[in-house]
């Protein structure tokens, strides 16, 4: 990165470890477009011990951890009147939403939603379909839980084109960060 040029700004990267605020493709800070007062949470996904793409079909591992949770700091949960097990709606700043159960714990950073990936699939045989005229039944355990990717932000600076929020240093889809709110349902 030290010798690379930022493809969005045309300026060189710093070359040293530093903090960069999340920005949209036009350089606007994310919090300028989506104020923290409206969307106070950022999201982070992590790999669960017993759940990944290679383990989705292992029924024993699925039984150990059948669903994930919307994990938030216990102090944030208290401020929102939430308790572990409460069902919530997670809404992104660009309008997509998903649902999950709260897990309140002190090990999550304040104003952060932590979600184990490998859950909440909307494909991977979660829908019935046909192959060569033969019906293939859905395998529902793969759709249990929530998936943070479903509510990833779109970058509104691209107008009517659908373009996901990008991580500025690499240009890849931003899997972490974003702007979200949580509401009890």
Positions of the model-derived regions?
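Long, low-complexity segments enriched in small/aliphatic residues
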Residues: 1-60
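Long, contiguous, secondary-structure-rich segments that constitute the structural scaffold
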Residues: 5, 54-71, 75-185
